[in-house]
A protein has these predicted regions:
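Glycosyltransferase donor-binding loop in the core domain
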Residues: 62, 138, 165-168
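Conserved acidic catalytic loop of the alpha/beta-hydrolase fold
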Residues: 1-9
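Conserved alpha/beta-hydrolase catalytic His-Asp/Glu region
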Residues: 65-107
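Catalytic active-site module of serine/aspartate enzymes centered on a nucleophile-bearing elbow/loop
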Residues: 154-200
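Flexible "cap/lid" loop of the alpha/beta hydrolase fold
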Residues: 22-63
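Short beta-strand immediately N-terminal to the catalytic nucleophile in serine-hydrolase-like folds
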Residues: 11-13, 38
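Conserved serine/cysteine hydrolase catalytic core
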Residues: 95-152, 157-160
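Gly/Ala-rich beta-loop-alpha elbow adjacent to hydrolase catalytic centers
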Residues: 13, 17, 21
Length: 200
């Protein structure tokens, strides 16, 4: 943000990126005008044990050297079995890119997420407006995550993206963009809606 000359921005984070958005709101509150959390990969939901069990074959595939299978199993877990046509249509080459970056994801990013700690105490230091977003067709664990987020932030706004799952930004971009624009417009930066920064 400093590099491009933005003193502050609206921060949008999806999945693991939503955890980055929360950490940024804690570490640099003067730079964060509002936070939009798109189905954050929140720890501490009631189905955490089931999620861990579902990820075991993913980790096993990666450790065996079958990186493409590991990525496929992971994306099926978070996005549903029908994720590939949706992803290929919106972002050609995205799967191949994910496979190419699998070492970074499995060796660094996933470990960092497991170590990420956020709860009511941390939430108490986040004073910026919060928008909690879920997809209407997402797996139940994301609804659990949404409930957890709203327990941390009782004043948070909630929006359900119709006809969308975890890939909500590519399944229904218009509905999501309209809701984000409305949210940003009601929390202007210096009298204008200001730039937005997206983390994934």
């Amino acid at each position: 943000m400093a590099h491009v000359g933005w003193p502050s921005a609206h921060i949008v984070g999806h999945s693991y990126g939503a955890l980055v958005a929360l950490q940024m709101a804690l570490d640099s509150p003067e730079r964060v005008r509002s936070v939009a959390l798109l189905e954050p990969a929140a720890r501490g939901v009631s189905s955490s044990a089931e999620i861990a069990a579902a990820l075991e074959p993913v980790i096993a595939a990666y450790r065996s050297g079958d990186t493409a299978r590991a990525v496929d199993l992971f994306l099926r877990h978070v996005c549903g079995d029908g994720y590939r046509p949706i992803l290929d249509r919106a972002v050609p080459g995205a799967f191949a890119e994910a496979v190419a970056e699998a070492d970074l994801f499995f060796q660094a990013e996933m470990a960092a997420v497991q170590q990420f700690s956020f709860g009511p105490a941390e939430a108490g230091h986040v004073t910026q407006p919060v928008l909690d977003v879920t997809g209407a067709n997402s797996a139940p664990r994301f609804a659990e995550g949404s409930e957890l987020v709203r327990s941390w932030f009782p004043q948070a706004e909630h929006f359900v993206v119709p006809e969308a799952g975890h890939l909500l930004m590519v399944q229904n971009p218009e509905a999501l963009a309209q809701r984000l624009a409305d949210f940003f417009s009601r929390h202007p930066i210096g009298g204008v809606s200001g730039p937005g920064l997206v983390t994934h």
